[in-house]
Structures are given as C-alpha cells and as structure tokens.
From Swiss-Prot:
Tissue expression summary: Expressed by the venom gland.
Gene Ontology cellular-component terms listed: extracellular region
Keyword Ribosomal protein: no
Any GO MF annotation of the entry: calcium ion binding
Function field: Snake venom phospholipase A2 (PLA2) that shows high lipolytic and weak ADP-induced platelet aggregation activities. Also shows weak anticoagulant activity. PLA2 catalyzes the calcium-dependent hydrolysis of the 2-acyl groups in 3-sn-phosphoglycerides.
Organism: Crotalus horridus (Timber rattlesnake)
Keywords assigned: Blood coagulation cascade inhibiting toxin, Calcium, Disulfide bond, Hemostasis impairing toxin, Hydrolase, Lipid degradation, Lipid metabolism, Metal-binding, Platelet aggregation inhibiting toxin, Secreted, Signal, Toxin
Name of the molecule in the record: Acidic phospholipase A2 CH-E6'
Length: 138
C-alpha cells in the first residue's frame, strides 16, 4: 500500500503522455515503468548521456531518440489515444504529434517486455558519473 501511495504522489502534476506511457508499460510489460525504469542505467529517466549499459537501457536510448525525432511537439506533455486490440497496442487519434509519441512509447514498452531478462539491479539508481562515455548517434 505504501508503494501505491508513493506512485500516486509522484504522478501528481504529471501530464500527458508520461501517465499514458506508464499505463502502456503496465499493459505490455506487466510492470511499472515508474518503479522499474525511471532511474535505470544511463538513459532511463530524465536526461540521458553516455552509452546504454544493457539491452534494457538501450530501450530507453532508442525511446529518447524517437522523442527527439518527433516534430513540432513536446513529447512529455502531449496526450494521445491508443487501444489494445488482440493483445496489440494500436495508436490512434487525429493528432500527428500524439500519434508519433504513442508509437515511440509503444516501441519502448514492447522493448521493455522483450528485454526483461536483461534487467540488472546494478543499473538501478546508476550513478551519472558512470555515464561519461561518448554517446553513440541516434
């Protein structure tokens, strides 16, 4: 119950796709993005630098790159619509920006699910000083 309270407090004031991304990760990977991926490796969480530490961290790197390629929108604030059909996430709606961000989030959620075996607790709360290598291009 305490964990649920912490999650609720952390989500206060969070807008748009961040909440939707959390819900999508829960649906696809069956785990909380906030609790598993918000402070993992060099790229999961706010910011990102250095080289991805493993396949899970690479999911976040690719997600950051995808957000960077989204045109004319603020990825962390735009809302989007999606549905689940036959176990698949389907992005919808009339907003091109929202659709781009939804597709980025969908790819990341699938990547997290597919790379659960690579998750290593040593990368949780990974010190930024360990992320100083030259970053690779998107």
């Amino acid at each position: 119950m305490r964990t649920l309270w912490i999650v609720a407090v952390l989500l206060l004031g969070v807008e748009g796709s961040l909440v939707q991304f959390e819900m999508m990760i829960m649906e696809v990977a069956k785990r909380s993005g906030l609790l598993w991926y918000s402070a993992y490796g060099c790229y999961c969480g706010w910011g990102g630098h250095g080289r991805p530490q493993d396949a899970t961290d690479r999911c976040c790197f690719v997600h950051d790159c995808c957000y960077g390629k989204a045109t004319d929108c603020n990825p962390k604030r735009v809302s989007y619509t999606y549905s689940e059909e036959n176990g698949e996430i389907v992005c919808g709606g009339d907003d091109p920006c929202g659709t781009q961000i939804c597709e980025c989030d969908k790819a990341a959620a699938i990547c997290f699910r597919d790379n659960i075996p690579s998750y290593d607790n040593k990368y949780w709360l990974f010190p930024p000083k360990n992320c100083q290598e030259e970053p690779e291009p998107c």
